[in-house]
């Protein structure tokens, strides 16, 4: 985990230096040419819309250059959002080595071949002050896992339902005078609203198919944000720490996640992004007495942990960037409606993963998010 966090922070620092240098060169070239709007290369947006014209400083961070779900410097503002995630898992690993279904069936009478998970997440955020943001998020899961037994019979296991509610405060603990660098302290609690009792054919489905955890969780974290007129970068670390066991005598393993990213605004309405996303998750502590660990790898509590590093690539669309309710760009009903809306699409592919297997490996993930700040 330390290697992932260190790698993320190193990447963020490198991107910060490169991005700042590129932005300074663009501003210098613009000054030489005598351009009054101080427009950056590849973007149609002028500094006057997003920056303080008198002081030359950023009034607030451009939300179009932030990852999905981050909101800062907007006292009295609300944000609502929706995110769809589709994750595909195909094949199994033991450590970093592939293991075939036929090999797994020598250890267990049943083996998973592949799995898909769809998550629909709804989010609402409110900023009572410029430093404090409060948010609530709740997901809905649809999971489907294809299985085969030693006799060659194929069957499908399914698990659907509402997941655990997350309540998260976020506090701005540091920012530079020009507001180009910010440090946010994350906290929160996970409320066990998701079910751990889902059944199929009269039998309880496996741990990974249940939509909930059954336990209260702590959600600490730390986020760094950096931004210029056309570039942004950052890194964060978040953890899910389970408190105690649920009423089926187990608790899911703690999870630790870190990521680093860089974004570039190409036009006034389009930005691209890339980054690294690392995760470490632990094995299950305890065991559900209704799940036989000898039946399949997904019922063994000791075959659930692992770690993974993904590469991500994304696009962000902002139809009316930097309006924030002001004139002249928000002078009509249509532009007022579009102001604050944002659509993001991100794909992830694993670079490396090591699993306490046999365990299904991730093949790819796609995230589609919409948010509206008003």
For each feature predicted by the language model, list its residue ranges:
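Outer membrane beta-barrel transmembrane domains
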Residues: 93, 97-103, 252-374
